[in-house]
């Protein structure tokens, strides 16, 4: 089982690496690409907001389908969504660009990209819940390192060749995303009854795990504190999305350029690796609920630090807090949801995390961020983000309690 775990960790690391370099191109450099196509900040905000709104619809639908479907595997569902993204992106590259065409395709591509991210997490958890000791944090950290390298080089490429290089880079990266997802599967050894009993995988539990998945409304009625937690998650990610989307504007505000933006993104992503890679050991010492609260606090600290940054170097320094904010929150929240939510609704639970931190936060941050930038400037935008994130931290502290892992079986922490 250890050999299978190592193999699947590497394969999942390949998925995370390829996905996050593609995200770097299509999402983190979205403002750069769209500015070059003569979109203003408000229009960019609307495009990314509509993408997030569409993902709000797609994520629950795909999650419910994945929870209930007996014939279509989660991996095949992901591959279908990815071919859609690749086809749309190829159209955008081939066809002559117009305001309407770029807007519609960019919205669709980003909406589906946002949707597949939580499904990847569910894909990994399927194996972990069967007793495969994959190192999720290490695999996710590989994604961060890849994002860091891509941010640095893409920033340099844009300075040298212009923003038109972004789309071809994305297409090449996305071929790797499709390939890595196709390769992510492995046959597990058949367990003896004694091994099943040791792991708590008795026949009674298997029968219990085959219960019908809940509808969205019933799910939230059964998990009211989780719904409150999601509100807090959306609020702490509000500033995170603002900073990522409009980092080029923040850099220009303090005298920086596209290359500086790439360096800043690289610093943040490189520093994510230690926390993610060692999360499997950290979570044995500190409760996952405590880690989420700590990470939420550092989202607010990072936003406040960038608000006060007088120059490019201090913006770079502010990215150090990413190591305790985003880097801890990502694996901690996924482990938390896996322990909190019953098996038949786990894909839905992971997807709701995506709805909160990508869909809701992305919608509100991009919608208001562009308007705040055009009307009041960078400082007002960052101040708003810091206040919203601080409130989100308080909500998370109120709403999170350590889950009962025995109740839902298959806990990982």
Language model: regions and residue ranges:
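Juxtamembrane intracellular "pre-TM" segments in multi-pass secondary transporters
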Residues: 1-6, 185-230
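Helix-loop boundary and gating motifs at the non-cytosolic
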Residues: 2-52, 225-233, 237-264
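Hydrophobic core of transmembrane alpha-helices in multi-pass small-molecule transporters
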Residues: 17, 99-116, 123, 234, ...
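Central cavity-lining transmembrane alpha-helices of secondary-active solute carriers
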Residues: 46-64, 266-278
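Helix-to-loop junctions at the C-terminal end of transmembrane segments
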Residues: 58-72, 158-159, 275-287, 373-374
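Structural signature of the two symmetry-related core transmembrane helices
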Residues: 75-90, 290-305, 386
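Cytoplasmic helix-loop-helix junction between adjacent transmembrane helices
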Residues: 109-142
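Symmetry-related core transmembrane helices of the 12-TM Major Facilitator Superfamily/SLC fold
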Residues: 166-183, 381-399
């Amino acid at each position: 089982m250890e050999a299978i775990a190592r193999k699947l960790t590497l394969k999942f690391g390949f998925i995370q690496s390829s996905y996050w370099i593609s995200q770097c191109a299509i999402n983190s450099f979205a403002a750069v690409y769209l500015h070059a196509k003569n979109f203003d900040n408000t229009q960019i905000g609307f495009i990314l907001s509509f993408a997030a709104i569409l993902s709000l619809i797609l994520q629950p639908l795909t999650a419910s389908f994945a929870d209930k479907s007996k014939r279509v595997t989660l991996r095949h569902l992901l591959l279908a969504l990815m071919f859609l993204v690749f086809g749309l992106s190829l159209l955008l590259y081939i066809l002559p660009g117009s305001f309407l065409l770029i807007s519609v395709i960019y919205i669709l591509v980003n909406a589906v990209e946002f949707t597949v991210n939580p499904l990847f997490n569910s894909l990994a958890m399927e194996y972990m819940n069967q007793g495969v000791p994959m190192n999720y944090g290490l695999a996710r950290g590989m994604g961060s390192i890849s994002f860091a390298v891509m941010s640095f080089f893409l920033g340099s490429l844009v300075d040298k060749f212009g923003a038109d290089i972004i789309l071809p880079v994305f297409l090449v990266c996305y071929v790797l995303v499709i390939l890595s997802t196709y390769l992510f599967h492995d046959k597990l050894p058949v367990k003896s009854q004694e091994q099943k009993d040791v792991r708590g995988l008795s026949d009674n539990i298997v029968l219990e795990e085959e219960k019908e998945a809940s509808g969205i409304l019933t799910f939230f009625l059964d998990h009211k504190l989780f719904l409150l937690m999601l509100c807090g998650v959306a609020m702490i990610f509000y500033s995170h999305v603002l900073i990522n989307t409009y980092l080029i504007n923040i850099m220009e505000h303090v005298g920086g350029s596209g290359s500086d933006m790439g360096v800043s993104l690289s610093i943040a992503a490189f520093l994510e690796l230690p926390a993610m890679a060692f999360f499997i050991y950290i979570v044995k010492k500190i409760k996952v609920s405590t880690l989420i609260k700590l990470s939420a606090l550092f989202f607010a600290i990072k936003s406040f630090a960038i608000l006060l940054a007088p120059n490019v170097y201090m913006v770079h320094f502010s990215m150090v807090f990413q190591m305790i904010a985003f880097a801890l929150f990502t694996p901690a929240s996924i482990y938390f949801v896996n322990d909190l939510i019953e098996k038949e609704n786990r894909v839905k639970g992971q997807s709701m995390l995506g709805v909160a931190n990508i869909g809701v936060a992305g919608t509100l941050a991009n919608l208001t961020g562009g308007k705040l930038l055009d009307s009041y400037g960078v400082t007002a935008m960052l101040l708003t983000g810091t206040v919203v994130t601080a409130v989100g931290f308080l909500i998370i502290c109120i709403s999170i309690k350590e889950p009962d892992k025995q109740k839902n079986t298959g806990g990982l922490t």
